[in-house]
Design a protein with these regions (language model features):
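GHKL-family ATP-binding catalytic core of two-component histidine kinases
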Residues: 17, 31-32, 93
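Short, high-confidence coil segments that cap the C-terminus of an alpha-helix
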Residues: 18, 45-47, 121-122
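The conserved acidic donor/metal-binding loop of glycosyltransferases
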Residues: 25-29
Length: 177
C-alpha cells in the first residue's frame, strides 16, 4: 500500500547506511556535481542541512524555465517567510533526519521538517547554483496554488503557531512566494 511520501522517505532514511541523505523525486534530476558541492559546503559551515538553487521546468510549457536562487545562509526566521529549500535539492545529515522524521503528508511535509530542523540547529547552507532541475506539473501536490496555500498555512499551525501568527507568516510567504 502507498503510505505517502513521508513514509517512503522515512523508510529510506532508516535503511540508509551513509552519513548523508539526499532526496530525489521521480520527475526531477540533478547536476552531476550537486552532491560534491553540497558536501564541501556542509564541511565548510558545519551545518546539518544544505540545499541548492533550482531550475523550474513547466510540464505544460517545457521551453518556459525559471531559476530560483538560494542564500548562502538560511535561518529559521528566513524560512518562515518563504520556503527556498526544494526537497530534491537537499543533502542532510542522516542522524538529523532520523531525529526529525517527515510526517503530515496533508501539508508540505518537507517544509515542515526543514523548519523544525532549523528551529533546533539554527542555519542551513545554500549552494546558489541551479543544481536541481525541478518539474512542475499542474497535477502535482504543489501545482494547484489554492491547495498549496492551504497546506502552507497548515505547516504554521503544525509548528504550534496561533491563528494570527500563522496568518502573518502565511502573508509573508505569499508575498515572497
Amino acid at each position: 500500500t502507498n503510505k505517502g511520501a513521508s513514509a517512503s522517505r522515512n523508510r529510506g532514511v532508516q535503511l540508509a547506511k551513509g552519513d548523508y541523505i539526499a532526496f530525489l523525486d521521480a520527475d526531477d534530476y540533478w547536476d552531476p556535481e550537486k552532491l560534491e558541492k553540497q558536501e564541501k559546503a556542509l564541511a565548510k559551515t558545519g551545518d546539518v542541512l544544505c540545499c541548492t538553487g533550482r531550475e523550474l521546468i513547466y510540464d505544460q510549457e517545457p521551453e518556459k524555465k525559471k531559476i530560483f536562487s538560494v542564500p548562502e545562509r538560511i535561518t529559521y526566521k528566513m524560512l518562515l517567510r518563504g520556503n527556498v529549500i526544494g526537497c530534491s535539492s537537499v543533502l542532510a545529515k542522516r542522524s538529523v533526519l532520523l531525529e526529525f522524521p517527515m510526517e503530515k503528508d496533508e501539508c508540505h511535509e518537507d517544509y515542515l521538517d526543514w523548519l523544525r530542523i532549523l528551529k533546533k540547529y539554527g542555519t542551513a547552507c545554500g549552494v546558489d547554483e541551479p543544481l536541481l532541475k525541478y518539474r512542475l506539473s499542474s497535477t502535482g501536490k504543489s501545482g494547484n496554488k489554492l491547495h498549496s496555500a492551504g497546506m502552507t498555512y497548515r505547516v504554521y499551525r503544525e509548528l504550534g503557531m496561533g491563528t494570527f501568527r500563522s496568518l502573518y507568516c502565511f502573508a509573508c510567504y505569499a508575498v515572497n512566494g
